[in-house]
Structure formats: structure tokens, C-alpha cells
Amino acid sequence: MAARGSCVSRQRQVLFLFLLGGLCLAGSELGRYSVTEETERGSFVANLAKDLGLGVEALAAKRTRVVCDDNKQHLFLDSHTGDLLTNEKLDREKLCGPTEPCMLYFQILMDNPFQIYRAELRILDINDHSPIFQDKKMILKILENTAVGTTFRLERAQDSDGGRNGIQNYTISPNTFFHITVHNSDEGMIYPELVLDKALDWEGQPEFSLTLTALDGGSPPRSGTATIHILVLDINDNAPQFPQELYEIQAPENSPIGLVVIKVTGEDVDSGVNAEISYSFFDASEDIRATFQINPFSGEITLKALLDYEFIKSYKLNVQAVDGGGLSARCTVLVRVLDVNDNAPELIMSSLVNEVVENSPETVLAVFRINDRDSGENGKMVCHIQENLPFLLKPSVDNFYILMTEGALDRESRAEYNITITVSDLGTPRLTTQHTIRVQVSDINDNAPAFNQTSYTLFVRENNSPAMHIGTISATDSDAGSNAHITYSLLPTQDLQMTLTSLVSINADNGQLFAIKALDYEALQAFEFHVGATDRGSPELSSQALVRVVVLDDNDNAPFVLYPMQNASAPYTELLPRTAEPGYLVTKVVAVDRDSGQNAWLSFQLLKATEPGLFSVWAHNGEVRTTRLLSERDVPKHRLLLLVKDNGDPPRSASVTLQVLLVDGFSQPYLPLPEVAHNPTQGEEDVLTLYLVIALASVSSLFLLSVLLFVGVRLCRRARAASLGGCSVPEGHFPGHLVDVSGTGTLSQNYQYEVCLMGGSSGTSDFKFLKSIYPEVHAYSSQDNSDGNPTF
């Protein structure tokens, strides 16, 4: 399965190589530069603008950048001058160790088109380290019969500097028995040997203490010292012997700590103390001493630290065996570290763009390099991204890859992508590294605002408070940022008679509509206009929606009584014959209401009456009718207070006062006349006075002449009416005719009378009806239609 995945990935890489024909992926050598170590940050290395043959502006336009192989920012490019400068103090010993020359490899990356230039920077050494001996005190045991000219190899000193600044010579403190010679090792390093110049005598001088000095070649030179303690021993005939001078072994780099790598064994044919052998490392570096340890009694060499093939591939161990008499032998153990697939691939990002414009195809998002510190198959890698993404991964030179868009993106469909770059090696087992890049798709103004509805209907009740919120018009824009910031406005209306700005206003930010002033349903029931929504993109895009405002009726108008008409001087008067049957139509109250709906549904009610049980009002049509037969006891004048009420919430009402005069047939000569210009209080007092007079007269004559007086009064009234001629009528309004506005008639017939007004000293006035003129003749033929609705 892994092999199949590798095959597919390789096929994709081959495809990518064909796709790279449109890009300039140069891998040219730029040059070699040098800089001295430990120089301050910002030290000049080279002028890349000059070396590349480009101007400073061109370098900036191409987004030129510097990438080092170890993924550390040792260098940086000054965009203003085109100079390549150091980004930190460079320590040659830290970067390269003892290796000489010390080279730092880096690349120059440029876009538009994409190019790579390889370059090298040599770190020049300065003498900033002194030689150091790992063992500050060395002990040598030399037999007293050792021949003159015998050499003894000493441990060399360590110097982190290289070249001429490394160790160049060794010296020893002045003496007559020894001198120092210098020899070159196979690794190209020098080591000291102690040479015996004069025969030793244990009895004469059993020990020596000498100072060994290591000198480097710097200017001025640096030095390091160690003490050599020489013990002169009595004669030991045989030195230890190793079976072989060179041991070669292999150790996997994942070997555990404490593993016995090898056991070396020396032999000594002597006996006793002279045959007792101790083992130790000789002339071992700091890395060897930190990684291995040797058992001084058994010769077992064990791991002290983990091996790392990528750091050190082999170790050369010099093992020394010393017997009890001071004689020694040496052998070499060569430990070769075997590589295992213990390093996952590395992904080193050189440049990264986390945002891309949605309509920009083939935009470079990232440039990165992959690396695996393992070797062989363990170091071979394949790289790929997820399927079904609108992105391409194109390989370049030196394990560089380019991540770019495959085509134009659509932010409204998907505004963010998480691209996972997977790098796998071909080792066993396979190791994988993943790096996720989060890419934001930036917006362009390619979508106009869209209203939630094509049309809106808003309802507002009349008599609203000015600046009242009546509704919200909402639009959305699938773009982002300023491209989605919507501004609302009222569009000009085509109705020239309507000034829209005097009726409504709109909040430009949130689309809230407000009524400028109080609306009047009776003046304006509904109106329409368009609202525009415009974004702030470039160019601006807009859309519009229709808004219809419907004004709801409020019960703000009280009923208006058309009939009977009211005035400030006196209530309207109707005549009622005493012979009227129950249900007789006295009059009909006609009223209208400017409101609509249930606010204009009117009902009628009798609030007050002189005789409450005599009259009734039909609630739905306003007809005032009698409820019973009239009697002689009923007073001749009745005042009715009628209420006209609508069905609003709360209801409104109007009242009308109606005065009804009772007549004994329409030929009766005398009837009381309603007061003219009297206030209601005075009228009630007059009625009370009349009642008192009648009551007093009745009590006085109750026992004697009650029946005769009653008959006489009636005969007297009839005789007086027959003998009475014409009389003058005082000025003042009095209806000469009665008109039923509704067409049904307030009385069963229409009459016209000649009347005269007679004044009295009591302050009251009476009508005298003389005779009927034009009986049964209608006064207004135009109003003779029955059951017709009035027109106003």
C-alpha cells in the first residue's frame, strides 16, 4: 500500500514538473562570499543587487529573500540598499566544529517569476579559543632500564579553532632527561611524543614533574598546559599485548545506553603485580569520553550516551592497557554507527502567504524545502497535499516545492482552507511529517446586496409619535469587510404629489425606518416607495426593494351628529301627539364617524330623560320611539339626552339634546314653548315651580271642586283657543318645518302651523297654535324618498 502511494505521488511529481514549464525556476550559482566570525550583527557580506544585476526596486518587487540550509536566519537582505548582511554574530566553532573550511550554504529566492540562486558563505576563523587538555595531569610510568631515545606518545590538546589558529606546536618545561617531538596523525592533527634523552635511575630520581604546553598559530598565539608526572619504575620485563591492533565493529544508532559495544582483552606474560592490566582511553576527544566508557578491569566498552548517525558516523577509540609494572600497549577500536530510520522528514518553510485574493489564479502561497537527515532509502522523500483542493504542489530544484492556487477561488463558497502538506520518507517503517497551512481567501466586491424580501409591507397606526420606528428593511451581502458594509437610502419616488422625505426617514447603517411626523389615516391610507441598499466596495454594487406603508386607523374622531342639528342657543324640538301609540317614531338621530372599521360602528343610547320610561332609542339606527301610551299625567315638555358612541378602543362619543313637546292633536291652540336662551339649570327650576303650583292648587280644591275644576279648565282652554285671533311672534329661531333627513320622517305626517308667542309676567312663554296650514303637504319633496341613505 505504501509502495502504491509512493508511485502515485511520484506520478504527481512528474506531472508537476511538466506544469513548471511556465515558471522560471532557476537554480544558478550566484557566488562565494566570506565573512569573519564573531562580527557584529549587520556586518556587510555582499551587495546582491549588484551581483544579480538588478535594481533595489526590482529586488523588492520580486520579494527577494534569503534562506539558509539549516533553516536559521543567519543572514538578511536590506531591502533599501540590496546589501546582504549578517543577522547575528556567527560562531565558526558552533557552526562547523573543527571542520575547515567552514561553509554556510544559502539560497536567494525571488518571485515573479520564481527563481533560486545558490550561494556559499565561508566563515573565516579568528583565534578566539585556547588549546585545552582533557586531562590536566598525565601520569607516565617508565622503567629505569628504558633505552635512551624511547618515545612515549602523549595525549594531545583540543583547540576549537581551525587552520592556522589550531594547535601548531608542543613544548615541555626545561629538563635534562626528556624533550618533545611533534608528529601528524592520520586525521591531519598533530600530537606530542615524549623522547627519553638520558638514562633513568630509580635510585637517583624516582619521579619527575614536567609541564607540557600546547601552542596555536594565532596572532598573538594562545596556549594551554598540562602536568606530566613521570614515575620511574623498577624493571618489568614484558609489556601487555593485544591480540590485534585494530577492532572494527558496527553499532545501530538506536542502541540503548549501557550496551556493551566490545570487550578488549590484553595479555601479559609476567606474573604478580606486573601482570595486572588496567584499561583506559588514550588521547580521547570530548565526544568520545561523553559517548563511551571503559571498564578499567574488564576492558568492556559500553555506551554512555545515545548514538546519532546524523551527527557522528564513526568513532575511533584508542585503548591503552597498562600493567602493574608501568608497561603499556595500545589498540584501536573503530565504531561505525549504522543508520536507522529514526529521523522524520523536515519541512522548512522559506516563504508563506496566508491570504490570497479570491479571483487570483496561479498565486504562489508558499515556498518550502524538505530534508531528511537519514541516508539511503531512509532519506528519500515524497511530498503531497490533500486531494480535491484547488491548489497545486509543484517541485523545484534542491528539494524545494511551490504551493500555488490552481485557479480562481470563490470566497463566498469557501473562505478558508487548511492545506496539509505531508512529507514521507521511504524507510522502514515510514516516517511522516505534516505541516498545515491555513489560507484565508480575501474578498473582492463581486456580490450585490440582496434584500430578504423583494417587497415589504409595514403597518403603522395613525397619530404615531414623530420619529417612531415603524420597521426594519434588511439586506445581506455575501462579501466581507467593506464590500459587505451596506448603506441604506430612500430612492426618489415617481409620485410628484408625495414628498417622501416628509413622511419617512431611514437609518443608513441598519435600515430602520422612522415616521417623520404623525400620520393621519383620514388623509393618507397607504403609500409606497423604494429603498436602496449599496455596499462600499469598488465599484459599488446596489439593489432595491419595494416598501408599502399601510396606515392603520385609530379611533381619533368622535361621532358627529348630523341630525338633529345642535346649536348653542337651544336644543332641537320635536312634537309628539298625545295620541301616539307605543313604538311611535319621534325622531331619528343621524350621525357619522370619520374613522373606519369598527371605529366607525356607531351605537345609540338614551342617557337621561324627563320621563325615563316613556322613550327608548334603538341602539343600531338611532330611532327614538315611545314605549307606552301617553297619559294626561305626562308633562307636556320632555328633555332627552342621547349618546352616540363608536366601537373604538377606547370608544369615543357625542351627545345630543332633544326636546319633545306633547300636543293634544296638532289643532290644539296652546302649548308651552321651550325656553329660549335659558340655561339647563333655569329650565329645571321652572319645571319644578310649575309642579309646585299645580300641586298646591290640587290640594286646595281636592275636597270640593276636583272633578268640576278639571272639566272647567279643559272647556276654558278650548273656548280661549277658539276665540283667539292672530298675535305677533317674538324674534328668535324656531323651526317652521320638520325634515326627516334619513327619509323615513320624524312624524307620521308633515304639518305647518301659524303660531304666536305670548309673554307672561312669570318669565315663561307659551305657544298658541292657531290653525293648521297646508295639512298633509310635504315641505320638501326632495327628501320624500324612504329608506334612503343621506348624502353629505
Swiss-Prot record:
Q: What Pfam families is this protein classified in?
A: Cadherin, Cadherin_2, Cadherin_C_2
UniProt-annotated glycosylation sites, renumbered to this chain: N169, N418, N452
Cell membrane: present as a keyword of the record? yes
Its annotated compartments are: Cell membrane
Its cellular-component GO annotations read: plasma membrane
Give the superkingdom in one word. Answer: Eukaryota
Note the SMART domains from the entry.
Answer: CA (SM00112)
Main localization of the protein described in the UniProt heading = membrane
Q: Which residues cross the membrane?
A: 693-713
Keywords, sorted A to Z? Calcium, Cell adhesion, Cell membrane, Glycoprotein, Membrane, Repeat, Signal, Transmembrane, Transmembrane helix
| Residue ranges occupied by any Cadherin domain in the UniProt entry | 27-133, 134-242, 243-347, 348-451, 452-561, 568-676
UniProt-listed GO biological process terms: homophilic cell adhesion via plasma membrane adhesion molecules
Q: Where is the signal peptide?
A: 1-26
Q: What does this protein do?
A: Potential calcium-dependent cell-adhesion protein.
Q: Spell out the protein name for this chain.
A: Protocadherin beta-18
